């Protein structure tokens, strides 16, 4: 047996002979030619025994004898007789990419882009070409791109996939001699997608060729390229990407690369281009930013140690220290201060005046007149070779092309105010609303619609030679120059979590001079959809739930409600809410139209560097709002431990983000904010004898199950089950009644059945009807929220769910709201996904587990509750208010019993309350001196609420991530707090709670070292073993 033919040799021969010959034909020819590719090509073309394909031969007008498709070119332009297949019916698989000739582009024009010389490669032998001969270029049809599999030798074995590259070959021929050769791959890659979309055409001729052609001879060609004006129409796709499996190739844009091949040089170059980052020309050396500690490069791996089916419960958040190292804490001491607006009723602190100046300057950018004539830094300006001196603009990052001047008005005007919690971001934002109002700026209010409307500059005098007008497009359809404004100009839109809706309104009314800002709360089922009404108010406040409800890709053209207004300014409070770039909330925020955009968040990164991508997309920070670029240059380097990813993030954030912490100092080195001291301590409790017996029995039973998983080597495969065991142990530390309430009750069993029912339903119902089926992850998320007792908002009434039901598509709604939305009483559409739902398919959503025993009648205090009551009794005489945090609303139910029996007046705030009820609770707690205690779920207290009326915080049960606890308790230690703050955390000694502390400390130590993936998995198992020792 001879030497095996390599795939490289097969590929070389196929690049010349095309895809019409099988792999076996090529391999046989290579064996006959002693592995000489040139000789093998000659054998294939010259030997009758090989099955010859139908090569392109001279065809008279009116026939189409080739299997490849031709485009119209010089001598055979669109509609000319020489255009193969242009005016004649052919089989569908051989349909010409030209379509139907000149009439296919009727009403548009062909603009001359430029010409160039290129070196073609001959695929034939003999004298067939001379200088000056006009050429016809043949392009493969897109339907020919399907991968094929050819059998292995003698029909056995796996076979080899047919080479995709053979389908991307562009060949050239003459009318008299037939096929001559092929053009270089880099040219074919650029031309194919553009020709297939009928956006360009090329003309060519032979410039020089050998007198006697041989296989793989070089032929010098002259080509001219024309582009169709339809490519620049408003609704035409201008960005073309070639199909590819790799991230780098997926960012290949044909048009900018075609301009490069044609030798076109921009007369106004982009400020930065993709090549700057690939070639590492950007200033990203260690001296350009703070040194990146090894710990930060391990964050992604440590995060993966905590990912499980329960999502947020065991989620590892980035610590404040790591966050400050990643995004940087700006030295704001050098910032200028801006005087407090006269319409603000409070005096700003110096650091707040600095923030106001910084925000105002960032919004102004360049003045409107200057910005309208300044080219956007991501775009380049080209002058085409057309005699009409046409100017086009290309974006090297996105591949977009336009004839409309892309000014800096389209750049982001805003940023991220990332001051740590408690520094007064709300007041700073209100001062910005007053200092730079939309009505005062209305005369110069130029806000391009990012989704389609373009700003057209009357001149580009600031550009360098040649001096051409951006609006000089002779013969161009006038309709392309019209700017149709279908949106109503409006004021400020503030989007916040439902909990903060009333607080924003109260803060504005409290701090703004009466009459200076009109405020409208856009919330509830009866909210108006009239854009004129929304645009009349200076400030419109709404929630992320309303935003998601009004966002619809199918109906985006209707322009109703929030999306019918072009906002002067949009502020996202708690902006990390949109961190998941694929979520509806994130997409809804990105779709808003505004001139100025702000993100307010003390935690711009919560779990991963990817969290920043959603913020940058919302802010329109180019090119980082494009996932391909973010993933290539930031996300992947970070995940691979390359410090360039983090350094690039710092360079991106430096001009658009301001972050100070409570430890930041002013020019004199003094803290920018002086607050009363905070005394934080841990109270360790001892279980009573009966509690210890109960806990030990539960622990032994749980450990037996865990040891079985260890013995089977399936610890990580059963991670969710193990967390369930730990959950019961943690609840037992609070009170044994909690375990009895959950245990194996019918309600808990119903949740498991509910999950199985949803997941098994994929093969029936919705799927058979071709409807959208909820993903397993989404179903598990819904079930877990029910398991935790989280209520959520009804997407119809936008209030807390009442008598909640679940649809087969896993959406939760109020029963009454859903049934009222149907036209008949038996079935209707799900208002979220529009799937058909019958009344019989509705499932009553189980509520938080309640207790199998009469807890009032059989009440017994746990050790932890006894310790809490002792602390509260010590504070009763002082009249200071306290907040009790717990993860479980069932434990809040239990806490109400001893509080009532000991005559402590209290109110309660958790996820089951409506917006009006929340506001009422917070107002009563702040203003009623007799109410000393607020019961609050940890999640409800972790979002933006100002709780400075209290000076004591008690965390009843530890969270997996201490940062979550910290965010909640710091709601009382912030601006407005005048008393010394007391923070107490309760831990039961000798239990899983105490070991959780040790695990967290161990994680922080591990982050400082470089771990392999195997070490991460091993560490994850070791942590679980620690919890069960």
Swiss-Prot record:
A GO term, aspect molecular function: hydrolase activity, acting on acid anhydrides, in phosphorus-containing anhydrides
Protein name: DNA repair protein RAD5A
Underlying gene: RAD5A
PROSITE patterns reported for this sequence: HELICASE_ATP_BIND_1 (PS51192), HELICASE_CTER (PS51194), ZF_RING_1 (PS00518), ZF_RING_2 (PS50089)
Positions of ATP binding: 419-426
InterPro entries in the cross-refs: Helicase_ATP-bd, Helicase_C-like, HIRAN, P-loop_NTPase, SNF2-like_sf, SNF2/RAD54-like_C, SNF2_N, SNF2_RAD54_helicase_TF
Function as written in the Swiss-Prot or TrEMBL entry: Functions in error-free postreplication DNA repair or DNA-damage tolerance (DTT) pathway. Required for homologous recombination (HR) induced by DNA double-strand break (DSB) in somatic cells. Required for damage-induced DNA repair, independently of MUS81 and RECQL4A. Plays a role in synthesis-dependent strand annealing (SDSA) but not in single-strand annealing (SSA). Possesses double-stranded DNA-dependent ATPase activity. Is able to regress replication forks with preference for forks with a leading strand gap.
The organism's taxonomic lineage, starting at the top: Eukaryota, Viridiplantae, Streptophyta, Embryophyta, Tracheophyta
GO cellular-component term (any): nucleus
Compartments where located: Nucleus
Domain of life: Eukaryota
Annotated Helicase C-terminal domain residues: 864-1029
A single BP term in Gene Ontology: interstrand cross-link repair
Start-end of RING-type zinc fingers: 794-834
Cited Gene3D superfamilies: P-loop containing nucleotide triphosphate hydrolases, Tandem AAA-ATPase domain, Zinc/RING finger domain, C3HC4 (zinc finger)
Helicase ATP-binding domain segment(s): 406-622
Chief subcellular location: nucleus
EC numbers: 3.6.4.-
SUPFAM superfamilies: P-loop containing nucleoside triphosphate hydrolases (SSF52540), RING/U-box (SSF57850)
Enzyme's top EC category: hydrolase
Annotated family: Belongs to the SNF2/RAD54 helicase family. RAD16 subfamily.
Organism field: Arabidopsis thaliana (Mouse-ear cress)
Annotated motif DEAH box, positions: 573-576
Keyword terms, alphabetized: ATP-binding, Chromatin regulator, DNA damage, DNA recombination, DNA repair, Helicase, Hydrolase, Metal-binding, Nucleotide-binding, Nucleus, Zinc, Zinc-finger
Region of interest (Disordered), ranges: 83-104
């Amino acid at each position: 047996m001879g030497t095996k033919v390599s795939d490289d040799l097969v590929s070389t021969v196929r690049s010349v002979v095309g895809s019409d010959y099988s792999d076996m034909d090529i391999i046989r020819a290579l064996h006959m030619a002693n592995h000489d590719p040139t000789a093998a090509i000659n054998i294939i073309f010259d030997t009758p025994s090989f099955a010859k394909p139908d090569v392109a031969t001279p065809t008279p007008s009116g026939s189409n004898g080739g299997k490849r498709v031709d485009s119209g070119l010089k001598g055979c332009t669109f509609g000319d007789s020489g255009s193969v297949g242009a005016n004649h019916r052919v089989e569908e698989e051989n349909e010409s990419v030209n379509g139907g000739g000149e009439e296919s582009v009727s009403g548009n024009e062909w603009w001359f882009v430029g010409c160039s010389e290129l070196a073609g490669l001959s695929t034939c032998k003999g004298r067939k070409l001379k200088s000056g001969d006009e050429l016809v270029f043949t392009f493969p049809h897109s339907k020919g791109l399907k991968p094929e599999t050819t059998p292995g030798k003698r029909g056995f074995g796996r076979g080899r996939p047919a080479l995709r590259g053979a389908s991307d070959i562009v060949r050239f021929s003459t009318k008299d001699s037939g096929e001559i050769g092929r053009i270089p791959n880099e040219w074919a890659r650029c031309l194919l997608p553009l020709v297939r979309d009928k956006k360009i055409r090329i003309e060519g001729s032979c410039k020089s060729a050998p007198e006697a052609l041989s296989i793989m001879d070089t032929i010098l060609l002259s080509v001219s390229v024309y582009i169709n004006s339809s490519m620049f129409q408003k609704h035409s796709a201008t960005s073309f990407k070639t199909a590819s499996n790799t991230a780098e190739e997926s960012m290949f844009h044909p048009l900018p690369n075609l301009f490069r091949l044609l030798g076109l040089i921009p007369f106004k170059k982009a400020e930065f281009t993709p090549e700057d980052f690939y070639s590492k020309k950007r200033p990203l050396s260690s001296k350009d930013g703070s040194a990146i500690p090894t710990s930060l490069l391990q964050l992604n791996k440590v995060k993966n140690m905590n990912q499980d089916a329960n999502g947020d419960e065991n989620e590892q958040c980035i610590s404040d220290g790591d966050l400050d190292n990643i995004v940087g804490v700006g030295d704001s001491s050098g910032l200028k201060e801006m005087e407090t607006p006269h319409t603000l009723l409070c005096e700003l602190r110096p650091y707040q005046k600095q923030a106001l100046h910084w925000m105002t300057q960032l919004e102004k950018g360049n003045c409107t007149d200057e910005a309208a004539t300044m080219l956007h830094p991501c775009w380049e300006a080209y002058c085409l070779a057309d005699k009409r001196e046409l100017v086009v603009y290309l974006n090297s990052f996105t591949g977009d092309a336009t004839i409309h001047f892309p000014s800096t008005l389209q750049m982001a005007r805003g940023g991220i105010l990332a001051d740590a919690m408690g520094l007064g971001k709300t007041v700073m934002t209100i001062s910005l609303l007053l200092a730079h109002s939309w009505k005062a700026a209305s005369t110069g209010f130029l806000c391009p619609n990012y989704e389609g409307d373009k700003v057209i500059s009357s001149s580009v005098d600031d550009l360098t030679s040649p001096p051409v007008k951006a609006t000089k497009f002779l013969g161009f359809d006038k309709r392309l120059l019209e700017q149709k404004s279908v949106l109503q100009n409006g004021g400020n839109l503030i989007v916040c979590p439902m909990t903060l809706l009333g607080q924003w309104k109260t803060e504005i009314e409290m701090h703004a001079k009466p009459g200076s800002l009109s405020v409208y709360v856009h919330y509830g089922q009866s909210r108006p959809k009239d854009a004129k009404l929304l645009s009349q108010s200076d400030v419109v406040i709404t929630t992320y739930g309303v935003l998601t409800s009004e966002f619809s890709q199918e109906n985006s053209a209707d322009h109703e409600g929030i999306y019918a207004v072009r906002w002067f300014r949009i502020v996202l409070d708690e902006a990390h809410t949109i961190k998941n770039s694929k979520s509806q909330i994130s997409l809804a925020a990105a779709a808003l139209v505004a001139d100025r955009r702000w993100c307010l968040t003390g935690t711009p990164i919560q779990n991963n560097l990817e969290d920043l991508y959603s913020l940058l997309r919302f802010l329109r920070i180019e090119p980082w709002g494009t996932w391909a670029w973010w993933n290539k240059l930031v996300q992947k380097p970070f995940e691979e431990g390359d410090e360039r990813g983090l350094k690039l993030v710092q360079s991106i954030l430096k001009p658009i983000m301001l972050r100070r912490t409570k430890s930041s100092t002013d020019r004199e080195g003094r803290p920018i904010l002086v607050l009363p001291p905070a005394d934080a301590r841990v109270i360790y409790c001892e279980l009573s004898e009966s509690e210890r017996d109960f806990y030990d029995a539960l622990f032994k039973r749980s450990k037996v199950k865990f040891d079985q998983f260890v013995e089977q080597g399936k610890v990580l495969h059963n991670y969710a089950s193990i967390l369930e065991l730990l959950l019961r142990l943690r609840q037992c530390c609070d009170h044994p009644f909690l375990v009895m309430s959950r245990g194996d009750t019918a309600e808990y069993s119903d949740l498991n059945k509910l999950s199985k029912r949803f997941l098994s339903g994929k093969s029936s119902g919705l799927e058979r009807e071709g409807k959208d089926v909820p993903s397993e992850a989404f179903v598990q998320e819904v079930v877990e929220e029910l398991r935790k007792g989280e209520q959520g908002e009804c997407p119809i009434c936008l209030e807390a769910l009442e008598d909640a039901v679940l649809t087969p598509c896993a959406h939760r709604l109020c029963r009454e709201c859903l049934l009222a939305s149907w036209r008949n009483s038996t079935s209707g559409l799900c208002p979220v996904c529009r799937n058909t739902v019958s009344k019989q398919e509705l499932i009553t959503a189980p509520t938080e587990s309640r207790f199998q025993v009469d807890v009032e009648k059989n009440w017994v205090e746990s050790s932890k509750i006894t310790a809490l009551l002792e602390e509260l009794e010590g504070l009763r005489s002082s009249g200071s208010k306290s907040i009790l945090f717990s993860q479980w609303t069932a434990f809040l139910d239990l806490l109400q019993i001893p509080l009532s029996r000991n005559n402590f007046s209290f109110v309660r705030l958790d996820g089951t309350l409506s917006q009006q009820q929340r506001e009422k609770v917070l107002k009563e707690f702040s203003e009623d001196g007799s109410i000393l205690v607020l019961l609050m779920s940890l999640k409800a207290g972790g979002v933006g609420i100002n709780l400075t009326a209290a000076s004591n915080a008690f965390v009843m049960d530890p969270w997996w991530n201490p940062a979550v606890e910290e965010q909640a308790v710091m709601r009382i230690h912030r601006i407005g707090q005048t008393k010394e703050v007391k923070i107490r955390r309760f831990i039961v000694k000798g239990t899983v709670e105490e070991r959780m502390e040790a695990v967290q400390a161990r994680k922080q130590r591990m982050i400082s070292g470089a771990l392999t993936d195997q070490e991460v998995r091993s560490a994850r198992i070791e942590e679980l073993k620690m919890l069960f020792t």
